[in-house]
Amino acid sequence: MPDHSDADLRAAFRELHGRSLHGFALVLLLGDRAAAAALAGTTLEVVGADAARLRHPERAAAALRADLRRRARRARVARRLSDGQLATLAGLGIGAASARALGSMTLRDRAALISADIERFGEDDVATILGTSTPQARRAAATARRRYVERHPDGDLDAPPAPGSIGARVVAVSQRTMGGRA
């Protein structure tokens, strides 16, 4: 009888991490559905092959995002957001002003902001995702937060997104950083 334990483990790994990794990819790649799906799929396949070693859910999630971020550096991400990208991000609760602010940031800044403030990973996991030390990751997240706020226009703030959405977290981070102005 064949041993399906490796295949079963990889399937469970994909089931556990697939949706959230795809969401990370969608925001990181500014709503580019095709690129996000391709990168998330490749990352799940490659990193998932080592699923037995990645038993701790947060460490596995950080390892997946680190791999996806490295792969995304080679992806062409449009800085000018299309209507389709804006619609995709709106579906995640990220309004046009927030999307434009994210679009003006570097991939690394977006990864820092998403992992530290939206997904709320611990500092060590953010360091893994960014491929740096914990103190450097802490500084990178603070810099990304500051850059996001600087680029988010005060007069064109998004309507509050549905509670629990990624967009709610983006707006909450903005509000904390701006002292309640967002």
Residue ranges and their predicted role:
Residues I94-M105:
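Short, Lys/Arg-enriched anionic-surface-contact patches
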Residues M1-G23, A34:
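A short, charge-rich alpha-helical start-of-domain segment used by transcription regulators
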Residues M105-D125, I129:
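Short amphipathic alpha helix immediately N-terminal
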Residues G18, S98, D109-R110:
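Short, leucine-enriched amphipathic alpha-helices that occur as contiguous helical runs
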Residues D156-A182:
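Hydrophobic topogenic segments
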Residues G18, L26, A37-G91, A141:
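Σ70-family region 2.3-2.4 aromatic/basic alpha-helix that recognizes the −10 promoter
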Residues G31-D32, D50, G155:
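Short loop-to-helix capping motifs
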Residues L130-A162:
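DNA-recognition helix of helix-turn-helix
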